[in-house]
Amino acid sequence: MAVVRRNILNNSSVRDQYIEGVKLLKNDFLRPDWPNTYDIFVIWHFHSMMTQTPPNSGSGRNAAHRGPVFLPWHRWMLILFENHLQRVLNDSNFGLPYWNWAADGELTPFQQKKAAIWANNCMGGSGEPVTSGPFRAGQWQVNIEQGFTPGSMDPTLVSVRRPLRRALGSGFPPKLPTRTEVRNAVRKGAPNVIYDSPPWDVNSAGFRNELEGWPDGPRNHNRVHVWVGGDMGPATSPNDPIFYLNHCNVDRIWSGWQQIFHNPKYVPNSSASPSLRRHRLNDLLFPVTESAVFDPIYQGRVRPSNLLDISSRYTYDTLTDL
């Protein structure tokens, strides 16, 4: 039976379960010689961003971002994260909640930083370190972050032991996307909408790039990362539990677009250039590492084509705002 993913601000039970679940994953070890389950997802996301597609290209495209696979790759990440939350919560009906940041985008910049999502009983507030809410200093620890090896300009993972960092509203522009901006992204090009197009990167026309947030304008998903700031900025952004609420809303917007326009086809298809490996319809999604070291997280050989119809897995409580 499909679970229902709900707005975290409309259901205190789901909110409390989510907070409990992510804390349980921080102390959950699938094997004694592995990092905790929560941090494995951080590692997976980091390596996806460090894997250029194709290698050494100038496109900026990587194995999970800046190209067509952005939406299905993160959809699969959310499904797996949701599965592990269900496991540690012992609740197979638990649905990953979302944060409708476009609703907060209707507030003034000052009000956005004081919105309900940042309350003490929800995600807590801003600060370096965060000093309020369930993920404040002493209650949540960042164990790995993006850093640099001495003498090298290539980012790497660095072991740390520190509190969570946020800098709400400190980026530019200092406000979240609005409902109108999201609706405009959903309906751009209607009725002849397209998912993506050449050159299949940050310069592409199509829904994926509008939602990911590379064209000039509202910048949608990207702007949320910048607006939250702190640990939401680098490739280790899943260190902040707000990451999953943000991406669940991104997935909700994609789901709404699929329904409104009757499942426009995913492109590029399987016959596209080998330089688009990892982004084509039937390419295997990037695993936790290239050698699948953490394969129990990855759970099999999954492709974008497997993730275009999610109706048997989950639904959203509403899409009417899109």
Predicted features, each with a name:
Residues M1-L322:
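Intrinsically disordered, flexible peripheral segments
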